[in-house]
Amino acid sequence: MEHNTNMLPLENASILSEGSLQDGHRLWIGNVDPKITEYHLLKLLQKFGKVKQFDFLFHKSGPLEGQPRGYCFVNFETKAEAERAIHCLNGKMALSKKLVVRWAHAQIKRYDNCKNEKVLPISLEPSSSTEPTQSTLSVSAKIKAIEAKLKMMAENPDPLLPGQSSYSYFKANEKKKCTPYHKSSLKSKR
C-alpha cells in the first residue's frame, strides 16, 4: 500500500485553509494529556521549526491549582512551520489522548465600552412604572449613595436598629451565674 504524503486529509486541509485568515503563526494545541510536561511538549514542537513563543497554561486557583489546563499556544517563526505542525500533530496520539491542533483565534473582547459603567439591579422586585428607575445608576453613584446613608446613620444613631429585637437574648444588665451547681451536691450522689 503506497502512501501519498502530498495528499492532506480533508480535516487538516480545512484547518490549514483557516490559517490564511490569521495574522501571525499562532497555534492552539488542545486535548493535551496532563502527564505531558511543558518541557516535552516544547521539545516536540521545536522539531517543526523555530518556536517564537510558547504558552503552557496551568490552573491558577481551585482544586486543580498548579495542574495543566490541557491546552497550550505556540507561535512559530513562519507560516510553513505552523502548517507543518498542524499537518503532523493534529490527531496524533500523545500518551493517552489525541492532540487537537488548530489555528489560534484572537480573543474578542466584549463589553469593553461598558466596563466602567456597570448597571446593577437595586431590587429584585419588579417595577410597575415605565419611567427609568434607580437600577440604571452607575456603580459610582450607588457607592456615593451608600456612603451618604452610612454618614447619616453615624450622625443619628437609632437606639433600636431595624432587625434588633427589644427582647434580645443577650442583655448588658443581666448577670451571668458563675457556678450553676454546688460541689457538695455532686459528691453526695456518688
Curated annotation (Swiss-Prot):
It comes from the Eukaryota. The lineage of its organism: Eukaryota, Metazoa, Chordata, Craniata, Vertebrata. Keywords: RNA-binding. This is Probable RNA-binding protein 18. InterPro entries: Nucleotide-bd_a/b_plait_sf, RBD_domain_sf, RBM18_RRM, RRM_dom. The keyword RNA-binding applies. SUPFAM superfamilies: RNA-binding domain, RBD. Residues 25-106 form the RRM domain. It comes from Xenopus laevis. The keyword Manganese does not apply. One of its GO terms (molecular function) is RNA binding. Pfam families: RRM_1.
